[in-house]
Design a protein with these regions (language model features):
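Short, locally clustered residues in the helix-turn-helix/winged-helix DNA-binding domain
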Residues: 7, 35-41, 99, 126
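C-terminal regulatory/oligomerization modules of transcriptional regulators
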Residues: 115-150
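Charged, amphipathic alpha-helical coiled-coil/dimerization segments
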Residues: 65-123
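N-terminal leader segment of winged-helix/HTH proteins
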Residues: 1-24, 72
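Short, hydrophobic-biased segments on the C-terminal half of alpha helices
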Residues: 46, 64-65
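N-terminal helix-turn-helix DNA-binding core of bacterial DNA-binding proteins
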Residues: 15-59
Length: 150
């Protein structure tokens, strides 16, 4: 089925990142956090990491504390109680050795697609996400209603 094929491809893509994390000696959550810092920018908040990765807040907090203890980053209060993530020199080196090569490979893969193919890929992924999101919300809302009224 199309769904089975989509799920197989999705899993294989995820496996590429999990294998990379493992080869670099990083947990999946640390890899995702570093990737997010690379993508969103230094000085981002823990909330930004949670929003970008869908990793639970407690897991992000634990992984960031570990990275802080290992000397890869510091947390800085700039506004209120929000903690901004700042990389140390070791953190910048870690990013250059682990995340940058992955981003480079991703960019290289995208350059193999035409402009139209890139746009179509993004358009279809967004459409698929929106449809899944709508169906999930509807299912969730109907499940709650059934629970209360049955």
């Amino acid at each position: 089925s199309n769904l089975r094929e989509y799920n197989r491809i999705y899993k294989e893509v995820n496996d590429i990142y999990r294998d990379a994390a493992s080869k670099f000696g990083l947990s999946n959550s640390v890899f995702d956090i570093l990737y997010t810092i690379c993508e969103v920018g230094e000085g981002c908040l823990q909330k930004d990491v949670c929003d970008a990765t869908f990793i639970p807040k407690q897991t992000v907090n634990s992984a960031i504390r570990k990275l802080e203890q290992e000397g890869y980053l510091t947390l800085s209060n700039r506004k209120g109680h929000s903690k901004h993530i700042l990389l140390t020199e070791s953190g910048h080196t870690l990013l250059k050795e682990t995340i940058f090569p992955i981003v480079e490979a991703e960019n290289e893969a995208f350059t193999e697609l035409s402009f139209e193919e890139c746009n179509l890929l993004l358009k279809l992924h967004n459409k698929h996400f929106t449809l899944n999101n709508n169906v999930s919300k509807s299912f969730y809302e109907n499940s709650i209603i059934r629970t209360f009224y049955l």
